[in-house]
Amino acid sequence: MAVLAPLIALVYSVPRLSRWLAQPYYLLSALLSAAFLLVRKLPPLCHGLPTQREDGNPCDFDWREVEILMFLSAIVMMKNRRSITVEQHIGNIFMFSKVANTILFFRLDIRMGLLYITLCIVFLMTCKPPLYMGPEYIKYFNDKTIDEELERDKRVTWIVEFFANWSNDCQSFAPIYADLSLKYNCTGLNFGKVDVGRYTDVSTRYKVSTSPLTKQLPTLILFQGGKEAMRRPQIDKKGRAVSWTFSEENVIREFNLNELYQRAKKLSKAGDNIPEEQPVASTPTTVSDGENKKDK
């Protein structure tokens, strides 16, 4: 099953993969991941390359290169056992392929290894993964609007994602969170996001670490009555994040989304009979006045 699950996910997502490969980030990343394969197998690129094969064929893998590639395959399969989305599967393949390419190029020629590392650094500095721009029902907060919105109507339950655009885990979770917002958003249950990589004071206020080594991104916090009710991942006594998988099933189960949704629907119906002097639940919107998804 550890092997079949990633393969099934990839086959199921072939149409989406074709759209990804049309984007510069994924196209260039795929080329870098296959760089050694192209150099070693395609003439005239392979002509004149050193080889340890007994037949002296420079356009085929020697036994050590095969061992490295087999080890890469094993690592990718083990890492993909914990991957949830196709983006995570592809990201793991790209990352470990580049590591293997670096080793293979340095083993072939130190100059080729240095050139490959330089290309990877330039790629990382100039190309960023495309942000999720699909349908969603999410309100984007900034450092001022998040507290105002949470306090505006305390009958509204909020689920807020604290994210950073540079985090691969946040990028992988984006389509899952968007899909949840489309399924469960209603008058009394709203979904929000705030970029703590951009608004560092928000990360400090809500105790979400933005360190590059952190395991706290993304963080989901449930607010009820304007106060934090729970969060995932949890933080232990030493201030470290407890490992938690951000899958759609886990979010629905841990945050009791089905129950929250039914309760919010009942409250919204009862709200029709609320006297005028009581505050009325705010109308959900996709973005706030001060924040827009495209600004990121």
UniProtKB/Swiss-Prot annotation:
It is found in: Endoplasmic reticulum membrane; Mitochondrion membrane. The keyword Protease does not apply. Residues 114-269 form the Thioredoxin domain. Its main location: endoplasmic reticulum. Residues 49-102 are extracellular. It comes from the Eukaryota. GO terms for biological process: brain development. Residues 1-48 form the signal peptide. A motif (Di-lysine motif) lies at residues 293-296. Pfam families: Thioredoxin (PF00085). The thioredoxin domain lacks the 2 redox-active cysteines, suggesting that it lacks thioredoxin activity. This is Thioredoxin-related transmembrane protein 2. It comes from Homo sapiens.
